[in-house]
């Protein structure tokens, strides 16, 4: 996906990028490739691939969720900043918090945010299980996002405790959504969520399957969740 395809593809979905925003994506790409030589951020480094599989793919969440109507986002296990930072570039009013367990990645994200002059971005070096028990952040975000970091039953335990009541947990997944959803139903219900929608589509150009799961927080998460670090992965809430 070249820059023209990227720009026109987003414009078709009602997202118009200014010259400044396009510059931010260019700098994001340059820094991603530069830092990737020092720390492992991504296996995808070819420019057209990054624009399609990282930038465009991240922004697809905004095709189905109206980010103009929310203020706060938390991104769990964002790695090199996906999906939240491409979304932040498109919707500059957002207050974005990223939680990642690897300090090197947090350092990259801080430097990146500074270079892109992104305001209202917070980067936390923490495990999602620990972060989700913090009283100052628990059940405080309009939207919590995660992109392919773990299966849905595990992700729900890491993300739903952070979503405020009536807010959304938005999971960006490749294929196998139905299978994951069946295994994750018990976790979603236990943690106070309810599936609102699954949006299935194909990424342009390469035609690979994508799914965006939108889960509404309808009641408070029981205090015992998330459990201690490692437990959600070892013993997921599955029926």
Curated annotation (Swiss-Prot):
Sample GO molecular function, one term: rRNA (guanine-N7-)-methyltransferase activity
Disordered as annotated region, ranges: 219-239
Keyword match Plastid: no
Database matches in InterPro entries: rRNA_ssu_MeTfrase_G, SAM-dependent_MTases_sf
Result of knocking out the encoding gene: Low-level streptomycin resistance.
Main subcellular location of this protein, as a coarse class: cytoplasm
Recorded GO CC terms: cytosol
Protein name: Ribosomal RNA small subunit methyltransferase G
Classification lineage: Bacteria, Bacillati, Bacillota, Bacilli, Bacillales
Keywords from the UniProt entry: Cytoplasm, Methyltransferase, rRNA processing, S-adenosyl-L-methionine, Transferase
Membrane-spanning ranges: none
Location of this chain's protein in the cell: Cytoplasm
Source organism per UniProt: Bacillus subtilis (strain 168)
Its job: Specifically methylates the N7 position of guanine in position 535 of 16S rRNA.
Binding site for S-adenosyl-L-methionine: 77, 82, 128-129, 147
Gene3D superfamilies registered for this protein in UniProt: Vaccinia Virus protein VP39
Keyword match S-adenosyl-L-methionine: yes
EC number(s) from the headed UniProt entry: 2.1.1.-
Family: Belongs to the methyltransferase superfamily. RNA methyltransferase RsmG family.
